[in-house]
Each structure stands twice: as C-alpha cells, then as structure tokens.
C-alpha cells in the first residue's frame, strides 16, 4: 500500500477477508490515534492491540526512528474479526490480512523478509520501484508464498526460480516520486 493509500500490489491467497481490505487498513492506520480515542470514549473494544509498532531498520529495510508514543498503529491489530499485520519500509506498507489465528511474530518476520527480497531485487523499496517492477514483484511473491504458506524467502535461493529482470530505479528518482 502506497503512502496515499493506493494499492500497488495485491495478492490474495485464501479469500477470507473483505475485498476492500486495503481501504479499511489504510483508514485504520491513518486515523489510529482518533480511532483509539473514540474506542476509549465509547468504552468499546473495536480492535485488539496485539503488539506495538516498531519501525526500526531490520536488515537494511525500514525507516529509522520509532520508540515514541505517537499514537501510530501497532504492527499487528484486529478489527471486526480481521487481523491486520504490517511493516512500513520507505513509506510503503507491506501488509498481511487474515481471519485465521496466526503467530504475529511469524507473519511480521515474513513481511520483513518480503520487503528485504524486493529491495534486494529492485535496488530500493519504494512505490515507484514496486510499480515499475510489478511483474517481478508478483513473481517473487508467487515463489515466496504458496497458497498463503511461506516457502523460500532467501534471495540466493530465489535466484534460480526468478526469470524477470528488474527495472532499476535510482534512489534519487524514487525520492522525487515520493514528493
């Protein structure tokens, strides 16, 4: 999901979540502080917080910072029976949604590895790079995750299964595209 809420790449595996999941996710994340205050004022529990968002760099992917209580959405949360798990890397959200009960740490690690592999292949992880390498990104996702079950997430192991060449996007070009 792009910083404006646009879906860049979408792959459904189990079809157990609503079609408009990206819109719901982006609205929840963007207005997390307001949603949290509304839930507290109403006395309801519209979402269960599973963990605290951590945007520290992992394996060179991610935005530095984090650690402050700024009402940002946690990395994993539940809303109306749908589990939303995400990592944010260079302004791009890598998101997983499911109704199944799954280990948040396992899914978050998978999302970090997906972000790292895309960065390894494209040179940078940005909205522009993912858009220009959409076919390559779909091919990577198909090799890394099969019917919702993670397979290989190693860049070296994927090299013999990936046949598309990346369209190289310079970091200065992708930075201008983010403006």
Q: What are these language model-derived features?
A:
Residues 1-179:
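Acidic, low-complexity cytosolic segments
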């Amino acid at each position: 999901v792009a910083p404006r809420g646009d879906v860049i790449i979408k792959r459904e595996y189990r079809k157990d979540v609503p079609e408009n999941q990206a819109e719901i996710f982006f609205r929840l994340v963007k207005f997390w502080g307001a949603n949290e205050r509304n839930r507290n004022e109403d006395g309801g529990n519209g979402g269960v917080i599973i963990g605290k968002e951590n945007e520290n760099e992992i394996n060179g992917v991610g935005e530095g910072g984090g650690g402050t209580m700024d009402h940002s959405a946690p990395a994993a949360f539940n809303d109306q029976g749908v589990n939303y798990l995400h990592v944010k890397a260079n302004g791009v959200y890598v998101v997983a949604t499911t109704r199944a009960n799954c280990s948040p740490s396992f899914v978050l690690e998978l999302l970090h590895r997906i972000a790292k592999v895309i960065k390894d292949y494209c040179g940078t992880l940005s909205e522009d790079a993912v858009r220009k390498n959409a076919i390559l990104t779909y091919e990577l996702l198909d090799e890394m995750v099969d019917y919702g079950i993670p397979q290989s997430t190693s860049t070296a192991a994927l090299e013999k299964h990936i046949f598309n060449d990346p369209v190289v996007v310079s970091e200065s070009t992708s930075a201008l595209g983010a403006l």
